[in-house]
Amino acid sequence: MRGFVPPTSSPDRGSKKVGRIVALDPPLESFQGYRMDLHTKGLNLLLSSGGHWSANRDADSVISRDDADYVVVIASSIGSYGFDRPIGDEYIRSDLTGQKHEACESRAWWKGQICAWSYSGRRHCEDVHIPFDFLRSDGLCYHIMAPLTFMKALDTHQADQLLSMHGSVPSAWSAYVTGRDYSQPTQYYTEEVADWRMLLREDDMASSYLLLVVTEGNAAELWTYDPYYTKTIGMEHGYSVRWYFIRDRNVGEAPIVLYARGGGVLKFIRLYKGRGTLTSLGARAMTTQEVTEFTCFRTHTYYFTGTKKYDCHPGGHRFDVPRWRSHINVSAHHLPVPPKCGCLKFPKLFKDYVIFDHPNVVGRAGEYVSLGPWSTGLQAVVTFKPQPRRHRVVLATYWDACSNTKRRVGIDVRTDRKNHMVWLKADKPVSREMWFVSEVDVVRVYVTWLSPE
């Protein structure tokens, strides 16, 4: 949608406010009222100095933060039109500005940076380099920018959304960029719906893996020294997260070798592969990924450089992880985001996390204690029953409180997904260890409720 949404108080619309709006490329002003210069070659030139522009400045009709409970604005081509400042609760844009993107200098690959800003000014960037050996990367330099930018409007910042699957075909963002319904075989194979250079078919996703590498200090690299396929995200307290997009059907069957340079220490790795079905849980997720965990051993340290060599061996059984919030509602076949499905079954705590300790929190029995704000990637709030053995109890999943936990652990939960807050209350004096779980890290908090007296 172009982002023209009348105000909630408009007499044409009434006073009812919708829950969530995602606006793609809302223009600064309406296109109504312009006149085309015959010497220009399209809208982009019309908006530049080569054309004549006489727009109506109807700012009241452009989307605003008050039009919904949560407003996301995506500017995928801000060099041509759109706002140059954050607007809405979340603002996403591409750093590839101008009519000629640096990503399009070669047809052999797509390279560039995608950035997103939260309304509070928090910035998240991804460096993306998709090589030519992906089956249909040729000619995608313009088109792939749209889904990569679109990804940032999701409720999580997980890199693995790029390889998410749904019904054995690419997930909703591929339908968005191609205009196809991949659940219909006639649309899957036809060459009349969209230009072939825009297509990202199933093989592009099914042939790819994601390798998650978490290090303390400098990032660890694959033995290939290949800078492509990767993106790195900084974490707190000197940790770094690197995602490798790997196209190798045999990956995970043999040790994976990594090198941590400049004093970096490897913490753990995981391997993800997109799947279209969820076999291990009795619930239907939006997308699913098969995960393999590894055990890593430091096998050598190079004397002159200090580089550490690690051999990582796959261990245990592979298991499925649901991705409940990986789609925006782009068609009737996809669930809305965030779905109103209450307490979802949290599948598993991974073998390895980066654990951060939060200062202890003390409250009074019968009163709520406030914790947060947390990142949008929060997956679960977990506590543990100490007796007779350390038993995990899930208090909330994906910002939905589990209402049946009060009778089991004596804790009531309230959540606010917009402001990323969690409130906990115990009716009796008790002390609990709380885990706030994301994909890579856990924030551990010890909460104590004292007697009201």
Curated annotation (Swiss-Prot):
InterPro entries reported in the protein's UniProt record: AB_hydrolase_fold (IPR029058)
Q: What is this protein called?
A: Uncharacterized protein ORF19
Organism the protein comes from: Fowl adenovirus A serotype 1 (strain CELO / Phelps)
